[in-house]
């Protein structure tokens, strides 16, 4: 019997079984069967290897991938376009993008799949400039015509980079030489939205005969990202199919632009429609509660999470911690924090900041040291939180030590916000010379960054009667063109304290010339789940509960006067 005649059908049978397993995503079984094939003394061919290489990529088995690549070289299969393209796909899945490009460069012949594979590999690894570079190279070096894969992958890179030039070039190609598929239409809408060309995105959207929910979501997101919330809602209502991503995009828009009541109303509509919210929806709503101080609504969402047995992962848990902390319920925030099974950097940082903002700086520092001890990675935001705690608690020595530990122990480079925290801490403690020295080291920063720290030092100089520093800072501020009214107002106050009225007039005139106006102070409060906002100088007569407000003010004033009289009498 001729054995060579038996090997072909046996290999064919193995190839069919391997493909069936790969189609069913049983990638581990693919590798096991491949090992069995090799044990039988069979030689994999250009149909076997692509299936195996795909499975290796999905399982991220680097060593196995290198072995199969070595076999392909020995067997003379590496230059087969099907095998080469599969090698590129495997290395891209393994994150080895340089080897992916090397395989591409060594191919004697490249088809459109090869070019698309390299472009999508760069896109998948976040190297969007390189993806655009490959697209340009394909245009110049190859006579191959772009296909849907080329267009969609390159448009993804354009979206990420906001590269309108290449995006419009592809759009013109599609209009003149290609048919507008749903995938291409989605990619064009997304690209134009990300580049801020809403009208062009809408034109493409309206021209599409068939649209899926992804296309509707991209267009809604485009309107939301530019603040055109009402137009987004109209389009949202028109969408024939609404998945959880579309609902989330619309709700995020309301939260982002402080229209929280409408976000909650939409959430209730979502429940009525029978759409189960995912964690992204809940995090968005909890963020809105935190931003507006809507404690009752936050508690209601927490109740919904418990009643529906939603898994409180580290993202949802952190959002709950943040919401309770910002609403002043710090003990509840602590309870939620310690219930989170896998706490990450964001979880710890959120609670540290919450403790600091609720006047518990000592506990915030304790938590910071606990975070260090358990080995959680500290990032730049963590240090802003802990330095804020030092600032609020007046812990000068701890603040200095932690600031210096950023580079010495944690390999985190201090940024302007960290310096600002330490400068403010030093100013509050009256260590003005040290604060000024630190500001001098920030001279490379922008005016918008320097003005707040100058203001801190100027305010401290005024409070501590340090005229020399006040005048030095005033000189620096006079040279800065800023739109922040507080800097100019504070400078005028310093001059007024020194009876330099002509300088006060000059500052006021400069504010007028620059069109800078001092915005009135504002305070807000939530009562029975309803938010109320009060602005200095505002006409309160229009408030529906003005009589009750006045009555309470009179009662409070009388109570304070009574207490004052009792203290005087005693």
Curated annotation (Swiss-Prot):
Keyword set, alphabetical order: Repeat
A molecular-function term among this protein's GO annotations: RNA binding
Placement of PPR repeats on the sequence: 10-44, 45-79, 80-110, 111-141, 147-177, 181-215, 216-242, 243-277, 278-312, 313-343, 344-378, 379-414, 415-449
Region named Type E motif: 453-528
InterPro entries to which the protein is assigned, alphabetical: E_motif, Pentatricopeptide_rpt, PPR_At4g14850-like_plant, TPR-like_helical_dom_sf
GO-annotated biological processes: RNA modification
Organism: Arabidopsis thaliana
Positions of the UniProt region annotated as Type E(+) motif: 529-561
Pfam family, one: PPR_1
Family label: Belongs to the PPR family. PCMP-E subfamily.
Disulfide bridges in this chain: none
Gene expressing this chain: PCMP-E55
SUPFAM superfamilies, per the entry: TPR-like
Annotated protein name in UniProt: Pentatricopeptide repeat-containing protein At1g31430
């Amino acid at each position: 019997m001729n054995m060579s005649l038996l090997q072909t059908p046996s290999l064919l049978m193995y190839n069919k079984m391997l493909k069936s397993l790969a189609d069913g995503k049983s990638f581990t079984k693919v590798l096991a069967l491949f090992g069995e094939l090799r044990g039988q003394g069979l030689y994999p061919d250009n149909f076997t290897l692509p299936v195996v290489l795909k499975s290796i990529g999905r399982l991220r088995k680097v060593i196995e991938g290198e072995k199969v690549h070595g076999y392909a070289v020995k067997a003379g299969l590496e230059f087969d376009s099907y095998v080469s393209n599969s090698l590129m796909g495997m290395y891209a899945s393994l994150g080895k993008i340089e080897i992916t490009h090397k395989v591409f460069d060594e191919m004697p012949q490249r088809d459109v799949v090869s070019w698309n594979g390299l472009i999508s590999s760069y896109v998948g690894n976040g190297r969007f400039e390189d993806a655009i570079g490959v697209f340009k190279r394909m245009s110049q070096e190859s006579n191959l015509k772009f296909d849907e894969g080329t267009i969609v992958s390159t448009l993804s890179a354009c979206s990420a980079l906001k590269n309108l030039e290449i995006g419009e070039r592809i759009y013109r190609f599609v209009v003149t030489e290609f048919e507008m598929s749903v995938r291409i239409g989605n990619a064009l809408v997304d690209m134009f939205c990300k580049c801020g060309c809403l009208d062009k995105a809408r034109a493409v959207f309206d021209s599409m005969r068939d649209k899926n929910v992804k296309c509707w979501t991209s267009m809604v997101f485009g309107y939301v990202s530019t603040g055109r919330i009402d137009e987004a809602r109209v389009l949202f209502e028109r969408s024939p199919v609404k998945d959880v991503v579309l609902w989330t995009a619309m709700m995020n828009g309301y939260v982002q632009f402080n229209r929280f009541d409408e976000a909650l109303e939409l959430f209730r509509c979502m429940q009525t429609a029978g759409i189960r919210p995912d964690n992204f929806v809940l995090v968005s709503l909890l963020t809105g509660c935190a931003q507006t101080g809507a404690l009752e609504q936050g508690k209601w969402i927490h109740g919904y999470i418990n009643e529906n047995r939603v898994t409180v992962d580290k993202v949802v848990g952190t959002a709950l911690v943040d919401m309770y902390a910002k609403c002043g319920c710090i003990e509840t925030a602590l309870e939620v924090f310690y219930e989170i099974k896998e706490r990450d950097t964001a979880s710890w940082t959120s609670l540290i900041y919450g403790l600091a903002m609720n006047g518990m700086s000592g506990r915030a520092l304790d938590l910071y040291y606990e975070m260090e001890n358990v080995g959680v990675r500290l990032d730049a935001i963590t240090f802003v939180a802990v330095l804020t705690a030092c600032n609020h608690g007046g812990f000068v020595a701890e603040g200095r030590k932690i600031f210096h530990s950023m580079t010495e122990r944690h390999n985190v480079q201090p940024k302007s916000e960290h310096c600002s925290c330490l400068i403010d801490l030093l100013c509050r403690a009256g260590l003005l010379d040290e604060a000024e020295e630190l500001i001098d080291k920030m001279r490379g920063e922008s005016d918008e960054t320097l003005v707040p720290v100058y203001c801190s030092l100027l305010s401290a100089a005024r409070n501590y009667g340090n005229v020399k520093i006040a005048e030095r800072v005033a000189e620096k501020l006079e040279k800065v063109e800023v739109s922040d009214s507080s800097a100019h107002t504070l400078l005028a106050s310093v001059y007024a304290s020194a009876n330099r009225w002509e300088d006060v007039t000059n500052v006021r005139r400069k504010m007028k010339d620059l069109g800078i106006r001092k915005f009135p102070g504002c305070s807000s409060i939530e009562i029975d789940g309803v938010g109320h906002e009060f602005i200095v100088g505002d006409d309160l007569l229009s408030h529906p509960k003005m009589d009750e407000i006045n009555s309470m003010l009179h009662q409070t004033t009388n109570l304070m006067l009574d207490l004052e009289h009792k203290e005087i009498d005693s």
